[in-house]
Amino acid sequence: MPVGTEAIRKVDFLAGTGNRFVAEGKRQLFGEVGIDLFAGPTESLVLADETADPFTVATDLISQAGHGPDTPAVLITTCPKVGRETIEIVNKLLSATDLSTPDVAKVSWDAFGEVIIVDTLKELWELGDHYASEQVQVFTKDPRDALDKMSNYGALFLGENTCVSYGDKVIGKNHVLLTRTTARYTGGLWVGKYLKTCTYQEVTSPESSGKLGRLCGRAARPERFEAHARSGDLQANRHM
């Protein structure tokens, strides 16, 4: 696609999800063609208070850890009891024999799983924003508070009725999202990525062109761009 064939014209832009091999392909082709963004392994973050159900938290963390052996699955909670019970349930679920990816999920959880206890909801929102995770589930009494309290994430999943697996499979969530804290400064794939801006300049007034020419000379010479200055001088001498 990026180089074309005898039958297919070379493309100008590559977009879409993929594993680490797709990401490496994009990296190597960056500059040869445009790309949507560089995305790392899937990330899942759960923000929970004392109202959260530990079994639901554990189930959803494992569902995402099964994506690959390098998938971060993190719980931040204000409730130590929720944290402890989540860890216990995760370990039990990972020992189940009916999971299709238990070994993958266990490797991921052992290497990248985290359970963090904070004292207040304020700390919960702040630390969640600091993580800037790809997918953030909010299991709090008022999950919509996250819309006002947070700004760094790929996608929010509000309430225990909204699991990340829905986003993966059935509710049409954007699948090209930010990972590795890049949500701190940009957003995921959107329609603007498929558009480009073209501009043009035209000075229609000779007098204005002359005045701009004098200004151009004064701006260019201190920077030692004499050729720039002379281009402006030409217009100034012609029209002033």
Swiss-Prot record:
Binds 1 zinc ion per subunit. Zn(2+) binds at Q64, H67, D168, H228. The active site is at E134. The keyword Oxidoreductase applies. The gene is oryD. Its EC number is 1.1.-.-. This is Histidinol dehydrogenase homolog oryD. Belongs to the histidinol dehydrogenase family. It comes from the Eukaryota.
